[in-house]
Amino acid sequence: MKVTKPNWVEHTVGEKKAKTAIYSISVHPDGTRLATGGLDHKVKIWSTLPILDVEAEKEEENPKLLCTMSSHTGSVLSVRWAHHGRFLATGSDDQVIMIWGLDPDGGGRLWGSDEINVENWKALTRLVGHVADVVDLAWSRDDTMLASVGLDSTVWIWDGLTFERLRKLDLHQGFVKGVCWDPVGNYLATQSDDKTVKIWNTEDWSLAETISKPFETSPQSTFFRRLSWSPDGAFIAASNAMNGPVFVAAVIDREGWASDISFVGHENTIQVAAFNPRLFFPEGEPKGRATASSMLALGANDFSISIWRNTLYKPLVVLKDIFGADLMDLCWSNDGYVLYGSSVDGSVCAIQFEPSEFTDLADFSATELVLREYDYKPKRAHQPLAVHSSAASITNGFGPSTTTSTHVNVLQPKKGKAKRRVDLSNGNINAGPSAGPSRQALRPPPPVDPFSGPIQGFASPSTAQASTARMFEDAHRAFGPGSGSISGTSPRAGDKRKASGSYEDPTRGVRGRGMPVQQPIQQFEVQIIRAPMVAPSPSDAGPSKAYLPYPQVQSILRAQAIGNESRSIYLEARNTSDPKGENVLCYFADGEQRWMDYLPKAALAVTVTKNFCAAACEDGSLRVYSPAGRLILNMKLSGLVYDLQGEDKMLLIITMDCQVRVINVRNGKAFSPPSSIHHLLFPGSSSFHSFDIISCTVRPNGVPVIITSEPQAFAYDASLHEWSTIASPPIAGIQPLPSGPSGPLSVVDQIVAKSAPVTTTEKSNAPWIEESYVMSQFEMKLRGTVLLDSKEEHKHWLLGYMKYLGDENFAERAGEVMKDLIGPVYHQSKPTGWEPKLLGVDKREIAAEVLDVLSKTLQGKNVASVWYDVLDKMKADEGSW
């Protein structure tokens, strides 16, 4: 065993370059790079060669510091390499997760610093969801998912390829300070200051178990509670546990989640546990679960590290006072021979073992063999809670379509919205929404693994580096707004996100006097300037008053609309970071600026259609303009705007206080009074359990549609002044209704279906449950198509409903439907409230079509015969007049 503490691995602050805390450390899967995150807001990547080899350290041609990344605006609390080595995830107390990728063509001097980047790791995207410090990160073993935890008491699950949000878990009641994945793939474990470890089932993200006994008396003073899962999936080692007055690491057994065993010996709280990724087997014995053992490293606030085998009652080695302050993080190299640690004192250590010391260490094939014994096959499809574009199809007026969109908003940053996917297997970019009619194009890449193999050494480009270069270029295009197919619900951009746009300059007609010209920015960087100056007061937030996440002020917002005759229309808001500067709103059409205006405060959201454009500012003001630049509406809202969406002449506004408004811009009137969606997002009396908005749109008839991560879809019913459910996930064990024709409701159905967790629950034995479910689904769809003003879909579901009623002999229900369609048979002295038309079609014409379907069913013939007679008599009476 050899212990190395390189004094040149450091994070520094101030003019005197004083060493500062290194909160997290992670070694690359190929063992050549070490990533560190510190109090200086920076992420640094170091070469491990001069750390592990004294002779190599002396040679100047061996670089030590490979790259410094400084996009975070807060302390970097967690750094984690993906197992394939292509991505580095970092979490910070700026509430942001950054995903970094290697640009093989990069390098050079770091801006504002003397540091030279040998490699150029750039931010591919930023993940926004946490509203407090991001404390820990973990990649699933197959890298299909990334988990993050933070001081907002939430756990976020992200897609490991597209980085869309899959799920938010919010059952912890305290800061969540540690996370790890089950190597088998069945579970996720999280540890919190609420003195529990929670086990989550990855099939449906239900809570499988809560373990609290070992932590009942544990102190809440630790910065982290980093736990680790053994490579054979048999145990979890949880930090900061207590056994009476003794500081221990608790061992949680996978079988029954018992926690009777613990590792004892440290003199202060244990902050981090880290299992060696390799398994150990006695020589000469068959390799399997029964003979496998594992190695565990523990780091504590007594400034020491201990290394254990689960088959022994005492540690293999204890390194006392290896640091001068609390230990923050530990990680093992993939070969199992090197353990790295970091500390608040600003130093790192490398503990290197020789193969002769670990004679029973096995290769990864043995681990695979053990994990296969669990015979676990994931039933879930790793699909994100897809967010639909609000770009309206010309054919149906709602949601994405293969036809030309009515409008497309680009680079209007909103949390939890549609993202473009990058297919890293072939370099293709799918720019459409992540669910809906075009979903087929967004499936995961074929089985050939684009991430196989490590990133090669520094000396010469390799095939792996070329693959990384292509990945970096693809991701650059995907995370920038190079296409006009990203909707106004696209996610917030990173600290810096490059974008490009082409503006045609066709022959222009003669117009009158225009405004001073500013050119649209062809290449630009979107930067987070600051938080809004006006935000909901935390003191106002409580069980009955919860707020949506507030947006950040960005340097540039851009929205695009594609109108008739392929006219190119852009709206661009340019926010200034200079207190004395001006915030400018520019409108471009056909490749040139038509007008501009100065905003009173920085813009938080913009949207544009062929009929109007709108900008919401951080002072709560909302300004709506005509295409010629007339200020049509200038309103002061009750709160900051969370989202803006436009459709035809309708403007949808969602504010941070969960209020939804729809305004008819053409006549300047509200579609209905403001309505709250608080009860849709924060059900019950507690705001700790909440749902997210994964899609929000407005129909041309003014009806807003909200889809939540429950998942449920709601449309506002102006006649009731309430939200009506128009789509819900299927019931376990019952076959859902076949899909209907394309239209707004079918788009909503697809989002909800793909957002619903996969369940293996058996069908209920309750009597008539299937019939009840089928009829309620038909009836919900009928109401939904009326609210969404979808004539073709309504006809399809009405005829299907009547056929089902006839086949199953539900004569009374069929009779009620016919009575509503045909209306009063005789003249009524008092108004009955019966409307003769439905979706613009005469109800009695609809009745005739319905009767044709009903008459062809075995049980519905008699009902149809009665109503045929009524309809014929009414037609005869009308003819006699």
Curated annotation (Swiss-Prot):
Q: Name one GO cellular component term.
A: HIR complex
Composition bias of kind Polar residues appears in: 398-409, 459-468
Gene3D superfamilies in the record, alphabetically?
YVTN repeat-like/Quinoprotein amine dehydrogenase
Region Disordered, residue ranges = 398-514
> What's the main place this protein lives?
nucleus
Q: Where in the cell is it found?
A: Nucleus
In its UniProt record, which GO terms are filed under biological process?
chromatin remodeling; DNA-templated transcription; regulation of DNA-templated transcription
Q: Which UniProt keywords apply?
A: Chromatin regulator, Nucleus, Repeat, Repressor, Transcription, Transcription regulation, WD repeat
UniProt feature coiled coil, ranges? none
Q: Where are the WD repeats?
A: 17-56, 71-110, 129-168, 171-210, 219-262, 265-318, 322-363, 588-635, 688-733
PROSITE patterns with a match to the protein in the record: WD_REPEATS_1, WD_REPEATS_2, WD_REPEATS_REGION
What InterPro entries would the database entry show? CAF1B_HIR1_beta-prop (IPR055410), HIR1-like (IPR031120), HIRA-like_C (IPR011494), WD40/YVTN_repeat-like_dom_sf (IPR015943), WD40_repeat_dom_sf (IPR036322), WD40_rpt (IPR001680)
The UniProt transmembrane annotation reads none
Query: Listed GO molecular functions?
Result: nucleosome binding
Q: Does the keyword Ribosomal protein apply?
A: no
Q: Which family does it belong to?
A: Belongs to the WD repeat HIR1 family.
What the protein does comes down to: Required for replication-independent chromatin assembly and for the periodic repression of histone gene transcription during the cell cycle.
What protein name does the entry list? Protein HIR1
Q: Tell me which species this is from.
A: Cryptococcus neoformans var. neoformans serotype D (strain B-3501A)
- Lineage of producing organism: Eukaryota, Fungi, Dikarya, Basidiomycota, Agaricomycotina
